[in-house]
Amino acid sequence: MRRQYHFRQVGQDIYIWDVHHLVELTKTFVIKKVALADIRELNEAYWFPNQSPTTQQIIEHFQLVEAADLSYPIILCAEGRVMDGMHRVAKASLLKHGDIFAVQFAQTPEPDFINVDEDELDYDE
C-alpha cells in the first residue's frame, strides 16, 4: 500500500493519522458491513476541500478508484467518519453496491501528527 495520511480539521488544528498505523491498530477488529447511505463523505468535498481540482487530479482519483480492492475493509473513526478507504467507497458506489466492509474504532486514536505541513510528511513506502 502506498504511504498515505488521513487529515481532519479539528477546531483550529489539523489532525493527521498515518494510515499504515491505523491499519495495524485495526488488524484484529471485527469486520462489519456498513450501508453506503450512512457514509456522509459521499456527499462532501472529501478529496478537494476549499479548492477546484484540475482535470488531471480528477483522472488520478479515477485511477485510484478503479484500482481499489473492495475486499479490504474501510476504516471508520468512533463517530463513523472515514479515516481510510474513500476510493473503495467511491468504487462501491459506482458499482451500485448497497454496503461496504468496514472496521470501526470504539474510541478514535490520538493523531500521529498535529499541524504538520503535508509536504513535510514521509511518503516513501
Residue locations for each model-derived region?
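Short, solvent-exposed coil/turn linker segments
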Residues: 33-38, 99, 115-124
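A sequence-level detector for short glycine-anchored, His/Arg-bearing signature motifs
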Residues: 79-95
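N- and C-terminal low-complexity/disordered segments
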Residues: 2, 68, 121-123
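Short hydrophobic/aromatic-enriched beta-strand-loop microsegments
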Residues: 98-105
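Amphipathic, charge-rich alpha-helical segments that serve as recognition/docking helices
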Residues: 50-56, 107-125
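Short alpha-helix boundary/capping and kink motifs at helix termini
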Residues: 28-81
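Glycine-rich short-loop/terminal segments
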Residues: 1-46
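Residues that form or immediately flank small-molecule/cofactor binding pockets and catalytic motifs
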Residues: 79, 105-107
